Amino acid sequence: MSSAAGWVLVLDTATNTIVVAAGTPDGAVIDSEAFEGRYRHSQELLPAVQRLLERAGLHLNDLAAVVVGTGPGAFTGLRVGLATAKTLAHELGVPVIGVATSAALLETAGGGAARLWLPSGPRDRLVVVAGDPPLLVHDDSAGTETDDDLAIDLAGRASEAALERGRGALDRLPESLLRLGLARLGAGDTDDPERLVPAYAVPPRGAPASEAEGGVAWSRDPR
């Protein structure tokens, strides 16, 4: 890739899998890496970016934009990912574009009736349907996944088929995040770093999981 064309950095730390990728402005993935974060996102993310630069022969001075997954996901991972994306964008004077990790994962499934299942603490799960707010449900809903559903980070708490589809979605996450991010960038729709916040996989205030009857609407919490 010509350095004059610039390149796009893609980061996602919403799940236990850290995703780092580089792409071209026309949507081709140059290189990517995905690995288990082991709850060490703050120690693992920047070294992964450095490895990406070295493998692909890229330079930060040629960076054109940063695309970052915004969740829903775990508190620590998301904060590290967004802080890194914002810092790089600010220091290099390039736009930052937030993309819902859930939307990118569901996009890999081609839309349709697929639902995404994510952990929300030790006893509850979030279920996400494209275009709708996530719902918080009890873990006793395990086994209700359909043939189209995806499950992430729910080993032992979701069907093996849904977990396998989730692993496949994670494999395709770099391409999906890049595609969705570039669509926003092409429309001139970028984020103000001061207003870009993650979506945490926690119950909404005032509606603890123990009081949820089958599922409660969940909203972004900018804490």
Give the ranges of each region predicted by the language model.
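Short amphipathic alpha-helical face segments that pack within enzyme cores
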Residues: 44-47, 79, 83, 87, ...
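N-terminal phosphate-binding loop and adjacent alpha-helix
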Residues: 37-54
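DPxDG-like acidic metal-binding loop motif
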Residues: 67-96, 101
